[in-house]
UniProtKB/Swiss-Prot annotation:
HAMAP family hit by this protein: ATP_synth_epsil_bac
Protein's gene: atpE
Subunit record text: F-type ATPases have 2 components, CF(1) - the catalytic core - and CF(0) - the membrane proton channel. CF(1) has five subunits: alpha(3), beta(3), gamma(1), delta(1), epsilon(1). CF(0) has three main subunits: a, b and c.
Domain of life, source organism: Eukaryota
GO molecular function, one term: ATP binding
Keyword flag Transcription regulation: no
Protein name (Swiss-Prot/TrEMBL): ATP synthase epsilon chain, chloroplastic
A cellular-component GO term for this protein: chloroplast thylakoid membrane
Keyword Repressor: no
UniProt feature coiled coil, ranges: none
A Pfam family recorded for this sequence: ATP-synt_DE
Membrane topology: Peripheral membrane protein
Length: 133
């Protein structure tokens, strides 16, 4: 049994297809979703979306947003997203190193908050690459 998953950013459709299962990072932790899941709306955290599609797991790095689950359909609206298979591992590692350096040299509260968010995004992108099997 499957359900429809649609992952959207303001600029493009990342995913729109039938899937068997997902694991979604929300602001209150990860949730697993199978067909006939109870209807909910939830905030999506910066994190990994794991998608079970044709008996293999795929990853998408999500950069925060909202999800609506109901009637065997999930719509995920996020600020930005990248499929794990589209991310260059070397570039993701370099971005992580730059984000770590920026956090170390951040001076004001605002700079620390922005550097921390950049670090979370960089870690998420690298994790999306590294969990590809």
């Amino acid at each position: 049994m499957t359900f429809n998953l649609c992952v959207l950013t303001p600029n493009r459709i990342i995913w729109d297809s039938e899937v068997k299962e997902i694991i979604l990072s929300t602001n209150s932790g990860q949730i697993g979703v199978l067909p006939n899941h109870a209807p909910i709306a939830t905030a999506v955290d910066i994190g990994i979306l794991r998608i079970r599609f044709n008996d293999q797991w795929l990853t998408v790095a999500l950069m925060g947003g909202f999800a609506r689950i109901g009637n065997n359909e999930i719509t995920v609206l996020v600020n930005d997203a990248e499929r794990g298979s589209d991310i260059d591992p070397q570039e993701a590692q370099q971005t992580l190193e730059i984000a770590e350096a920026n956090l170390r040299k951040a001076e004001g509260k605002r700079q620390r908050i922005e550097a921390n968010l950049a670090l979370r995004r960089a870690r998420t992108r690298l994790e999306a690459v590294n969990v590809i099997s």
